[in-house]
């Protein structure tokens, strides 16, 4: 889990637009965040396996 202070800091509007960055809406992780879902890769995978994300399914080729 991310530190609460860093999650709160990221939630505020930065003084300069380039300082903004994405965080996972579920756990607060700052890296590997899918913008479309607002989730990190770990949370995205867990929720997809649980069937909580409509339209997402495991692919194989």
Swiss-Prot record:
Binds 1 zinc ion per subunit. One of its GO terms (molecular function) is rRNA binding. This is Small ribosomal subunit protein uS14B. It comes from the Bacteria. Part of the 30S ribosomal subunit. Contacts proteins S3 and S10. PROSITE patterns: RIBOSOMAL_S14 (PS00527). Keywords: Metal-binding, Ribonucleoprotein, Ribosomal protein, RNA-binding, rRNA-binding, Zinc. The lineage of its organism: Bacteria, Bacillati, Actinomycetota, Actinomycetes, Mycobacteriales. Zn(2+) binds at residues 24, 27, 40, 43. One of its GO terms (cellular component) is small ribosomal subunit. The gene is rpsZ. GO terms for biological process: translation. Binds 16S rRNA, required for the assembly of 30S particles and may also be responsible for determining the conformation of the 16S rRNA at the A site. InterPro entries: Ribosomal_uS14, Ribosomal_uS14_bact, Ribosomal_uS14_CS, Ribosomal_uS14_sf. Its cofactor is Zn(2+). NCBIfam families: PRK08061.1. Belongs to the universal ribosomal protein uS14 family. Zinc-binding uS14 subfamily. Pfam families: Ribosomal_S14 (PF00253).
């Amino acid at each position: 889990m991310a530190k609460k202070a860093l999650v709160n800091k990221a939630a505020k509007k930065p003084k300069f637009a380039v300082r903004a960055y994405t965080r996972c809406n579920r756990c607060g992780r700052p890296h590997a965040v899918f913008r479309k879902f607002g989730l990190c890769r770990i949370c995205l995978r867990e929720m997809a396996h649980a069937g909580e994300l409509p339209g997402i399914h495991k692919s194989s080729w």
